């Protein structure tokens, strides 16, 4: 991955910059002297008072704008969940590694041992340097030519997870469990030997020589940045329920609910161009209606009215910078389901089309994604523009398919489009859009 752009620090925010008129940085700005002349500043002048100020603000170390501090003022509920996770780790209730999948991911618990979230550290992603799963290491060693997905920005899966949640909230789809970028540290995470030795050394120094140990900025293991997704209860793999529904067809009203929820999944996956959507990484929750005449097994939850909901998890391999055009096509596996052969409903059109047709909404969505993605130290503005170009093309195709009364299956059969933007020289705040079709096709179009 070519990462030639300047690094963007996560410390930066709008408060770090002053967009007003700058004060003169030298005495001559206030006295009109010529360059190189010596000026005596009177006592108490602004220039002299600034000279006596330290170059670095000593209070900044205690500033709440700590890059490793999890603050979510816009979402108090999510912030409280993170507080529970941090409190549990302090009490010795550590996250538990999930042994499924190809990356390091963890069930995070509260003080009572209840699972409250799923944490996926950046450096333990499928292609991260500290991935505890040996399968990707073996693939990189034995078959480097097929290693990775060249259409994706490597090691940004945690941003993709959070970005999918952002798109879900903006479009009001409500099928992605809330996901944000957080910092967590735990003994059960996969750290390098150096980090563990340093942590033990600092703890030993604090115990033996407290005066020395108190000088350390941090005693424990370094926090890891990653995505934290709220855990959803009562859901099972979609593949489980879809097979069940084939044997025991749903009532008409419940089947309608499933279709509407399925269409929301299609909208999300298509816009973010999810390259890893099988029937085993989206979930279904089905609460069966109360029925005293028949005895059903424990998989069925008895309620008064049938309720069916979907949860789109595992969104870490989305937001590509180009459409797949090498070995694999990374298709949407839901396209083979019978629900994909039904025309988009009027409900999903009314929910999505007004937003997608609004240029201001699309611009706001791009800016929100930019603010999220630029948190990564390896953020590349050029790569981000390519990701947005793909997303714009997906939005264009989706809008056209809904207007034309097409089905999700017909949607995925439309030619891939890229919509690039460029500044208009004569107009400072105007942009021109260039639409192009991808002619190159992957070698395996079905895989």
UniProtKB/Swiss-Prot annotation:
Entry annotated with the keyword Mitochondrion: yes
Record-level GO cellular component terms: cytoplasmic vesicle; dendrite; endosome; growing cell tip; membrane; membrane raft; mitochondrion; neuron projection
Stretches for region Disordered: 1-77
Lipid attachment locations (S-palmitoyl cysteine): 142-143, 145-146
Reaction catalyzed: a 1,2-diacyl-sn-glycero-3-phospho-(1D-myo-inositol) + ATP = a 1,2-diacyl-sn-glycero-3-phospho-(1D-myo-inositol 4-phosphate) + ADP + H(+)
EC number: 2.7.1.67
Keywords recorded for this protein, A-Z: ATP-binding, Cell membrane, Cell projection, Cytoplasmic vesicle, Endosome, Golgi apparatus, Kinase, Lipid metabolism, Lipoprotein, Membrane, Mitochondrion, Nucleotide-binding, Palmitate, Phosphoprotein, Synapse, Synaptosome, Transferase
GO molecular function: 1-phosphatidylinositol 4-kinase activity; AP-3 adaptor complex binding; ATP binding
Protein name: Phosphatidylinositol 4-kinase type 2-alpha
